[in-house]
Amino acid sequence: MKPSREELKKRLTPLQYDVTQEEGTEPPFRNEYWDEKREGLYVDIVSGEPLFSSRDKYDSGTGWPSFTRPVDPQGIVERVDRKLFTTRTEVRSRNGDSHLGHVFPDGPQPTGLRYCINSAALRFVPVEDLEQQGYGHLLHLFQ
């Protein structure tokens, strides 16, 4: 069950709350994970559900973490976003219903997709901590 807005305001930073609950966007190149190079898993800051692997992360030059695919396509929800005078595809986490960012059809192969994700919506779990933090079942992604 998703925490109440009051609980989320206590638990998240103002930026994390704005991004995940109000569909905000953090500044490019001034966010926690755009240049993260370690191997690991990116999980939803609200629910902890696994979202993206460092194995699918690449430098898109945009200043936000970019991925070619989610860990589990069923773990995300895509919605049409018509804000800012354009039509884009918003990406949200399925269980936490957190706004994560957007997906664009201009990524590298093999998918041709660029999941442009706000660092503020994510928590990074280094590969060496996966077992301890309950994500041991995903270690196969890094072998």
Swiss-Prot record:
MsrB domain: residues covered: 5-127
GO BP, sorted A to Z: protein repair; response to oxidative stress
Keywords on record: Oxidoreductase
InterPro entries per the UniProt record, alphabetical: Met_Sox_Rdtase_MsrB (IPR028427), Met_Sox_Rdtase_MsrB_dom (IPR002579), Mss4-like_sf (IPR011057)
Ranges that cross the membrane: none
GO MF annotations in UniProt: peptide-methionine (R)-S-oxide reductase activity
Keyword Transmembrane helix in record: no
Gene Ontology CC terms, in alphabetical order: cytoplasm
Catalytic center residues: 116
PANTHER family the record matches: METHIONINE SULFOXIDE REDUCTASE, PEPTIDE METHIONINE SULFOXIDE REDUCTASE MSRA_MSRB
Cited HAMAP family: MsrB (MF_01400)
Protein name per Swiss-Prot or TrEMBL: Peptide methionine sulfoxide reductase MsrB
